[in-house]
Amino acid sequence: MLIPKRVKYRRQHRPHRSGVSKGGNRVTFGDYGLQALEPTYITNRQIESARIAINRHMKRGGKVWINIFPDRPLTQKPLGVRMGSGKGPVEKWVANVKPGRILFEASYPNEEVALEALRRAGNKLPCKVRIVKKEDQF
């Protein structure tokens, strides 16, 4: 699972989900990318699930890059606890994703296999995504 090794403050405010991605919206490493179309939080479990889906479909011939990292903690108080008494414990780690952000990149010799692998990864994510090619964006 992807979580930070150490953080200065264990509990943070919730990040804003509005606006568009300022950076990380071009395919740089691979030949194909998975681009978010909606603002959302993506948990470390969802990132891992999508990564496994890509790797299982592409097998050995390809390479995958994960361009997001879950660096923001989300806290939640236990069920049945009254209001007050401080902020709850960290429940999960999330990546704050805004529209336009490239989430995953892949390269594979066969284009159909790479696109199908990214499509399967998109089904594991909580937002609408589209597949972009490196040569189409310039």
UniProtKB/Swiss-Prot annotation:
Gene Ontology annotations for the cellular component aspect, listed alphabetically: cytosolic large ribosomal subunit
Pfam families: Ribosomal_L16 (PF00252)
RNA-binding found in the keyword field: yes
GO molecular function, one term: tRNA binding
Alphabetized InterPro entries for the sequence: Ribosomal_uL16, Ribosomal_uL16_bact-type, Ribosomal_uL16_CS, Ribosomal_uL16_dom, Ribosomal_uL16_sf
Region (Disordered): 1-24
Entry keywords, A to Z: Ribonucleoprotein, Ribosomal protein, RNA-binding, rRNA-binding, tRNA-binding
Record carries keyword RNA-binding: yes
One of the protein's GO biological processes: translation
Chain intervals with Basic residues compositional bias: 1-19
HAMAP family: Ribosomal_uL16 (MF_01342)
Family: Belongs to the universal ribosomal protein uL16 family.
Stored NCBIfam families: rplP_bact
Function: Binds 23S rRNA and is also seen to make contacts with the A and possibly P site tRNAs.
Record's subunit section: Part of the 50S ribosomal subunit.
Record-given protein name: Large ribosomal subunit protein uL16
Gene behind the chain: rplP
